[in-house]
Amino acid sequence: MSSLPTPLPPYKWTLLTAGNANVVYKSDETDLLLRLRRNRNAPSTAEVDEYLTGTIRPAIGPFLFHYTVVNLPLGFLESLPEAENLDLGEPLGLLMENLGPKPNETNVLKSHAVKINYSDNWESYTVELKPKWLLQSPTAPKDSINCRTCALQLKREKPRICPLKLFNEDEQTSLQALEDVFPGTQKQFEPLAKFFSNSELFAEIRHMQHGDELGILGYANYVQVPPQFVTAMTMRDVSLFVHVQGDSVNGKIVDADLKSVSEKRDYWASLETDLIEGGWYEKPGTNCLLRN
């Protein structure tokens, strides 16, 4: 535990969103959000805190979302909306900053798994997306024309911006990737493209993803996968919020939880096998950087 848990303020909470592992609540009495554990097989809140403070924060520092571990009062979980979806045995929660759009950002663009809330005249905007795989899969075929993310989106018929383009070290490549999906926004997205190309955050994400040297199929005979692989998988599934106001850009990472290898290992291996045997790495139909 990074520090002793603090008491949860006595606010009235309503459901904001529910994922596979966690449920998030909001309150009109605070700008903070309350994240609670849903899946009993997922790491506990204490384990999540230990992983974030011991592994993730030392690597990405100020780019990790701010949170406080809080004690949950007896009977509190049962009193919440959607209580049946919660792990009622979990004694802790995370009180976290709200990285969502600002009140004046009432306009919305959404495409290719990118959501943008923006104010009138684009005075400010908030971008939400998952960076995904910033490096190719270690087990991808040598003649691949699709990166791991593009291969999967082709298989699932759910288009994404190629992350090798979006987070490219060349600003123009990043800017063009945004312009291709959101035409007519080049001027507005110049600060965002500069951040995607130059921020040390994405260099560190690449470094952490590079800790997976063999790929999930390469660890088939391992009783336990190394911790570097688990961290690589975590960093392939984080969410990113970026707030832009003028030339000021502030980005934060969330959903950087420790992955449950016992639950995910077979799924990861099966998915990679499907991508390879189905020829998805070599099929045309994407706008992947590797095709150029």
UniProtKB/Swiss-Prot annotation:
Motif (EXKPK motif): 128-132
Entry-linked Pfam families: Ins_P5_2-kin (PF06090)
Subcellular location, record wording: Nucleus
UniProt keyword list: ATP-binding, Kinase, Nucleotide-binding, Nucleus, Transferase
Keyword DNA repair applies: no
One cellular component term from this protein's GO annotations in UniProt: nucleus
Primary enzyme class: transferase
EC number: 2.7.1.158
Family: Belongs to the IPK1 type 1 family.
Record-given protein name: Inositol-pentakisphosphate 2-kinase
Lineage: Eukaryota, Fungi, Dikarya, Ascomycota, Saccharomycotina
